[in-house]
Amino acid sequence: MASDFSTGLHGGHHETLEQYNKVLEELAADAVMDPFRVEYEKLHRALRKTYESQARLAKKCQELNSDISLNASKVQSALKLNEEDRETAVALKREINKAWKMVDDSTVKETKAKETAQQLKVEIANLSRLVEEGAGLAIGEETALNELLKQKEELARERDAQVEQLMKYRSDLMETQEKLRAADAEKLQLDADIQHLRGTINDKKAEAEREIRKKERMEKEMKELRQQLEIRSSEIKSKQLQVTSTEEQVARLEQMLRDAKFATEKVQKEYNMLNERMQKLHHDLEEQIHTNTQLLTENSAKQVELRVKEEEISGIKQEASRVNKLREQTVKKTKQLEEQRVEVEKERDVLRAELAALERELEAKQKEVDVEKKKLEELTRERDAENATQKQIDLVKINENAKRNLEQEIQGYKMEAQKQSKLIYQLEKEREKYDLEAAEAANKYQQAQSEVKLRVDAIMDLQRRIAEGESKLKQQQNLYEAVRADRNLYSKNLIEAQDEIQEMKRKFKIMQHQIEQLKEEITGKDLYLLKEHFEHQKVINEKEQLRNELDRSKSNIKEADSAINAQKVEIDKLNHIINEADQERRRQKKEYDIVVNERDILGTQLVRRNDELAALYERIKIQQATLQMGQSQYRDRLAEIRQLKVRLADLKRQLHLLKSSVSNIDVLKREVHQLGRELLQERTKVKALSEELENPLNVHRWRKLEGSDPGTYEMIQKIQTLQKRLISKTEEVVEKDLLIQEKEKLYMELKNILARQPGPEVAEQLSIYQANLREKTKQMKAMASELNMYQAQVNEYKYEIERLVRELNEMKQVFFDRRKKEQADRARTMKASMYGPSLLDQLPGGSGTGSGGMATGGGVGMS
């Protein structure tokens, strides 16, 4: 396209050159047309410069098109790479989802295996109990037990394999996440490259559009110069015709000059008056030109100030872009904190799951404790049935003293104290009952003495076991109370978390409202840009008006040329020339009024622009204040982030300690299981002894008692040690509760701080707004550059008008001097021919009058 344009341009230039040479030859033949020939050469030089600049612009447009095509290919390749990276990210996400599914399957299998193992443990416990109760097992039961043991070992091996597979899946998942993060980073880099290339392409396109507009403007000016050249050539031809007609009129004037000799003096007086009037008008015109030049200098100074203000605005915009970059970095750090918060929440969910498992186990233990309580009640009833002697009464008193000591031990536990008080009340009632029965059974004491001795050992053993069972029951109840307190605490935390979620939703709505406000501000800025665009169009219209004024000035030059030719007409038409001069004065007065009005309009526009600049400065100050406030808030957020990192490290350390303490649960489970087995064994022994007592094989058997009752001092020491241990454990529990409350408070503060941070949606909208702001800034810069270019063109046109006016005045002066000399010579020859040489010598004033008249006419022509 550019090559075709250049070939057409060279062809048109060749035709114009031929026309120029032809017209130049015609002008060179006539010496009178030398000034027009000089002006014609100037116009041709300007036209030739226009052609050269147009060719240069066409070449530059071709280079810009090649750059745009190259950048477009780069953008396509970058987009292709971006698409490939997106596909890779999708594939990696699918692999991650698949890995998570496999992890879930493995966890389900692991839970099933645990349940199966638990069932097998229960069955093994039942079988072991049956083994202890019965005399022996059948062959089929032994085989079933062996099969169950084999299944247990197989399930254990399968569980270990599942755990190894789960660890493998977790390592694969971590590797996949690392790959995904690397792919995301590469994608972000490619997106940044694409944005950079797009910005480069937009800059190239804007430059190409500016060059195209400049080319169109040069083409338009070239057409106007061609039209002016054609008009000048037609004017030259018409002036040649006027010169021939003027020569004919000169001949007639010489004939008419003889007849007008007597009217010359009267005309001379009127002409002198008109000359004075014209000089006065000329002086006024010079003063008006001086005022116009002053206004032009003031306007140029205002334009310089406007450029300085625009440079300050561009510096402020650069500072705003730097602040936006800092805000983007803050948003990235906030995202990282959000990811850390998500990880902490995941760990919290895991702990909650473990807590739920512990609660289930605690419920199972509670059921076992209830069963043990029932068995203890049965044993106490059996014991009460056998306590029929005075020895039993003494033992009851000892038990009552022990009960009182135990009541003092468990004053802190309200639930257990109530149970013990009820039991004591029941025992007291039974004691009264036994007192009545003791009076009746005194005669039976001797018969039951031997039986009592046999059962005392069994009763003491049972009491010892009952005390141990009660202590274990108390421990289980303490554990149950601690777990229940933890459950209440976590339920309270759940309620607080739900409240925080509601608060975050409310903040999200507020942020949505703020986003809507930002959108409204952007629409306001768009309206402001449209207003600036319309003002730019107004400046273009003013440029067109100035161009029209230039055309009018050229037409004025043509009218002045016609006035020069009209001065060759006969002297009788001087009155008509004076009237035309009055009309010219009125027209110039109108033009002067128009110029004054335009000056007033420019003054009002300048005032409005100053007001707009003041408003812009106010906005800039407000934005600077908001930026400073944002910087202070940003520093505060950094300090909070550092504090939160320290607290997060403490929380992780405490979480690790808690996990290590949780690992002791398996040991406790094993101890509970071992104690259960021992309890079953003891029950079988008790049952066997009771059967032997009911059905004794050897009635007269007896043996020496090896055991003895523990002393009261030893029991008190044991109770005191147990009380000390209980107090220390209670203090540890209180410290742990305080520590947990402090960590929960710290966690809530961290969560609130994270909730105040903006989300990724706000960051995306902010990036979109920043991109729109950059585009609008580029548009404003382009419009400002075009405005400066048009103002420079207007100044060039004004300087060109002044130069043409000066050249016209110089040409008029030269022409009038030449005509004055010619008329003086003609008048002198005419007088010499009319009066003769002797009479010419006697009339020195005649030539002076004629020359004076011509000089006055020259003065009129000058005006």
From Swiss-Prot:
Pfam families: CFAP58_CC. Residues 836-863 are annotated as: Disordered. Residues 845-863 have a biased composition (Gly residues). InterPro entries: CFAP58_CC (IPR049270). It comes from the Eukaryota. GO terms for biological process: cilium-dependent cell motility. Disulfide bonds: none annotated. Residues 107-600, 631-815 form a coiled coil. GO terms for cellular component: axoneme; cytoplasm; motile cilium. Keywords: Cell projection, Cilium, Coiled coil, Flagellum. It is found in: Cell projection, Cilium, Flagellum. Belongs to the CFAP58 family. This is Cilia- and flagella-associated protein 58. It comes from Chlamydomonas reinhardtii.
